[in-house]
Amino acid sequence: MMASMAALLQRLLVVVNQVDPGAPGFWREFLVGMLKPVAATAVVAMAVALSFTQRLGLEGEMLYAMARAFLQLSVIGFVLQFIFTQKSAAWILLAYLFMVTVAGYTAGQRARHVPRGKHIAAVSILAGTSVTMALLVALRVFPFTPRYIIPVAGMMVGNAMTVTGVTMKKLREDVGMQRGVVETALALGATPRQATARQVRRSLVIALSPVIDNAKTVGLIALPGAMTGLIMGGASPLEAIQLQIVVMNMLMGASTVSSILSTYLCWPAFFTGAFQLNDAVFAAD
């Protein structure tokens, strides 16, 4: 299965080497190809019109979001094209660290009342995704090249970002709402970790449930992005499911490691050196 999947990826992604921005006619073909994405903005116009008629006040935000997405994807396309043609592993590391940094900042913003939340989220995401990626490379599921590692890492980082942010946010909320229970446990001699075990478990269950539910229903409700991309790229459905199974496995692994680690890193900030709840953390709105 691993050999056939690697061959499939190689066959589908070999077109990358055939794209050269310096080649004659490249920019004309690129601009012609962008006509379809531009035409697709018609559905955004429909959404903006509906927002206006319903007085939602989201017109400006919708237009800004789509313009930003258009610009970001256009830029990242050229950046990835450059990286994919490089042989140095340094480019892989640089791109990966950039994704982790942005993801850590975003997850930390969700849990902004957790002290050092951005750093905790970044470290958790880095650990969860790097361990998972190392296992995949060691098992020869993916070769260590930019065109394989960067897209796969992007999927893992994005998923781990969401799960980690939810875990940290829910943990702080639950500890704050059940402060009396936690303080009683501390008074009876429990350690901070023991006193918050129930809240930790609840936050992890809430954060990981969407990942688990997605794995349960994959292919039944909607075709996942990786599988859809492969099929649209010319692969057979049987070939596409091989990669999608790997994707679901790696998302589950990376998300679980990242979310669990984030609880170990953020809960000490909830307590003082005297093993009392830190009022400053839970007094924030």
Curated annotation (Swiss-Prot):
Expressed in roots. It is a multi-pass membrane protein. This is UPF0014 membrane protein STAR2. It holds the Pfam family UPF0014. It comes from Oryza sativa subsp. japonica (Rice). GO terms for biological process: response to aluminum ion; UDP-glucose transmembrane transport. Signal peptide: none annotated. GO terms for cellular component: plasma membrane; vesicle membrane. Keywords: Membrane, Transmembrane, Transmembrane helix. The keyword NADP does not apply. Interacts with STAR2. Its main location: membrane. InterPro entries: UPF0014_fam. Belongs to the UPF0014 family.
